Each structure stands twice: as C-alpha cells, then as structure tokens.
C-alpha cells in the first residue's frame, strides 16, 4: 500500500526482466509513477498497475454491457487519508477506479464536497452521464457501488481478492 517504496521494489523486478504488476498506488507522487514507467521502458519490461476492483467479475459484466449501457454510477470505497500520498491516491483510488471501470473515460467536469466523515465527488462525462464517488473516512471499510442501466439499478462488484487479476 505504500507507494513510496514501489520504485525501489520495481527496479529489482525490471532488472530481472520479469513482467511487473504494482498494486495501487503505483507511486506516492506523480514523479515516482513517471519514473517507474520510464524504468520499465528502459528495461523493456511490461508493467501495469490497478486496483483489483477493476477485475471483479461483476464489474467486468457491467463494463462489457451485459446489463445494457451504463447510464450512470455511484461508487464508494474507504478513503484513508495518508499524508505521504496525494488525496485519493492511497485508498480512495479503489472507488475511483471502480467508477471509471463502469463509466469509461471521458469525465470532463468534477465537483467535490468534503466533510469529516466523507468526500463526495460528482463527475459529468462528455456524453452527459453522471457518476459519483464517495470516499468513506469514518465507518466500515466497504467497497462497491450501483450502476444504473436500462435494466435497472445493478450492484457493482466489491473486493474479491487478487485472484481476479489472473
């Protein structure tokens, strides 16, 4: 979970020439993330970074249109604030990645409201759809969401471990 050590760890993998997966966050700063990708390119090593939530079977079904077009989505995850990492980069990234898994790219406008217990971010996509992310600061560490489709409101997948990456 500590992105500050990922560059050092990844360098050992890159030197071995093995494919590299780095759990979120890829780095504690944008500079570290860029350095990791530059080193992967230098050593010609395939690399990817992701939240395992992207690959939950339910989220993949939603993404692939099994319930119809995603008309909008509301997603949530823990949002533990870690001073060594920017904003949602430590844990909030899980819910943000779930939202993008369901909605795809194209978010063009963002508004945010914060309180002691949560952060809520509302995004508008270029096609007019709206998606939200709730970063839970207090309360249980839960992951999930709701996707709105022509077939109704469908539960998004939560954390199912790392086996879904294989």
Q: Over which residues does each language-model region extend?
A:
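C-terminal helix-rich "cap/oligomerization" subdomain common to oxidoreductases
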Residues: 1-4, 12, 42, 126
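Structured helix-beta-strand junction loops
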Residues: 16-17, 42-43, 69, 106, ...
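C-terminal glycine/acidic-rich active-site capping loop/insertion
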Residues: 142-166
């Amino acid at each position: 979970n500590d992105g500050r050590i990922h560059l050092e760890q990844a360098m050992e993998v890159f030197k071995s020439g093995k494919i590299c997966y780095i759990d979120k966050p890829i780095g504690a700063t944008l500079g570290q993330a860029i350095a990791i990708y530059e080193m992967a390119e230098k050593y010609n090593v395939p690399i990817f970074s992701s939240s395992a939530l992207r690959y939950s079977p339910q989220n993949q079904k939603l993404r692939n249109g099994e319930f119809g077009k995603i008309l909008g989505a509301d997603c949530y995850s823990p949002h533990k604030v870690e001073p060594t990492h920017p904003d949602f980069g430590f844990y909030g990234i899980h819910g943000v990645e779930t939202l993008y898994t369901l909605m795809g790219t194209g978010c063009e406008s963002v508004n945010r409201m914060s309180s002691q217990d949560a952060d809520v971010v509302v995004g508008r996509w270029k096609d007019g759809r709206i998606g939200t992310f709730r970063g839970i600061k207090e309360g249980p560490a839960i992951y999930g969401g709701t996707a709105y489709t022509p077939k109704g409101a469908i539960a998004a997948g939560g954390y199912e471990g790392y086996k879904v990456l294989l």
